[in-house]
Amino acid sequence: MALAYTDVQVEVREISLQNRPEKLYEVSKKGTVPVLITTGGLVIDESLEIMLWTLKNNLDQTWLIENHNKEIEIINKNDILFKKWLDRYKYHVRYPENSKEYYRENCSNILSDYENQLSNTKYLLRDSISIVDIAIFPFVRQFANVDYQWFDDNYNKLTSWLAEISSSNLFIQIMKKYGLWNDNNKIKV
């Protein structure tokens, strides 16, 4: 979303994570997505780093606050703690040592913080959208999609926040589907 927000032109290469192309590993040893290669050849293979690079290298930095340590701290907590529990909640059959409800409860401990924050501000950090919202949104969306009714029943403010971002023109713009990339594909910008 940060790339689209700042109108950075990119070549999109949609891949199957079950059949990752060798070119992905040639560019990034991690073999994970997303990966951004700048026109200067810099390889960035972390979502947050891509967002920060995009926002810092464009004139419009309204998604950032002056000292963005707090933003980074919130995003890192989400990426480290919430993502761990989210994966176990979504794929609970792969983690039979605990119940689906156990994993949901661990996610809920973090979601409750977000819900409480939304009692004070329109978005997760302030009254205007920020990089925190954009970084955390996909994970909250994944959580909600496991059992939307339960999510909706328990998180009124997060449900509204999620609906607002999901219905934004920016989100709709980036969610268009692409065919799987191969060497013969034309570039999609």
Label every PLM stretch briefly.
Residues 14-15, 174-180:
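Acidic carboxylate-rich catalytic motifs and surrounding loops in phosphoryl-/glycosyl-chemistry enzymes
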Residues 177-189:
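Long, charge-rich low-complexity segments
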